[in-house]
């Protein structure tokens, strides 16, 4: 429950200044008295160009409307399967390394109480949340906005393909590790 003040670690590949609702959710949690830190990537959505003022190859720490934001190295989003996978896995790897570091702690120097994973594409963005859960034994709440690997079908991948089967395995592993999954559609519950 969020009645008591919590220290919340948010894992999401995209965050302000990128146009995603998770920014509003985090700012509302701060307004309600919770401590919130976001672990995100370099802003580059949707064009695949890192936004002006954000350095390539550097971790950037800032506070946006009361939310502490840590930006992890991310290869910008590009078209093409290989480039898209590099984008997905660069964030997954760098965010996981960060959450396991001594630097990823709440303002009191202790672990966060809960991890909130705002899951858009790709599902692998949840790897950092799982790593934090495993290290500190805290729960993960996932807000699932993009169902994997089903979202790959919209991109022309067939269910019989090796790519689909691989990401089906990855997705099942990730979804099983969540303590709670919030969904945007009742149809998601049939899959999850």
Predicted regions and their residues:
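A conserved catalytic-core segment of Leloir-type glycosyltransferases
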Residues: 40-102, 106
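Nucleotide-sugar donor phosphate/pyrophosphate-binding loop at the beta->alpha transition
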Residues: 124, 136-141, 149-173
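Structural motif
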Residues: 113-114, 180
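Helix C-cap/helix->beta junction micro-motif
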Residues: 32, 132-136, 177
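N-terminal subdomain of nucleotide-sugar transferases
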Residues: 1-63, 180
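A short, active-site helix/loop in glycosyltransferases that binds the activated sugar's phosphate group
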Residues: 168, 172-192
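Alpha-helix capping/helix-boundary segments
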Residues: 44, 122, 187-189
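An aromatic- and histidine-rich active-site surface loop
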Residues: 19, 85-100, 114-145, 150
């Amino acid at each position: 429950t969020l009645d008591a003040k919590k220290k919340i670690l948010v894992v999401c590949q995209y965050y302000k200044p990128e146009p995603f609702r998770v920014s509003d959710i985090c700012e509302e949690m701060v307004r309600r008295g919770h401590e919130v830190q976001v672990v995100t990537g370099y802003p580059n959505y949707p064009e695949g160009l890192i936004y002006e003022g954000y350095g390539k190859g550097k971790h950037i720490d800032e506070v946006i409307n009361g939310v502490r934001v840590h930006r992890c190295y991310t290869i910008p989003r590009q078209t093409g399967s290989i480039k898209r996978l590099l984008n997905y896995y660069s964030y997954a790897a760098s965010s996981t390394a960060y959450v396991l570091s001594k630097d990823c702690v709440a303002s009191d120097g202790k672990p966060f109480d809960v991890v909130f994973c705002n899951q858009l594409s790709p599902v692998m963005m949840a790897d950092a949340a799982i790593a934090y859960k495993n290290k500190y034994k805290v729960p993960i709440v996932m807000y699932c906005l993009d169902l994997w690997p089903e979202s790959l079908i919209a991109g022309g991948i067939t269910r019989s393909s090796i790519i689909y089967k691989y990401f089906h395995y990855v997705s099942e592993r990730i979804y099983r590790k969540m303590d709670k999954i919030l969904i945007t559609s009742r149809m998601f519950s049939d899959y999850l």
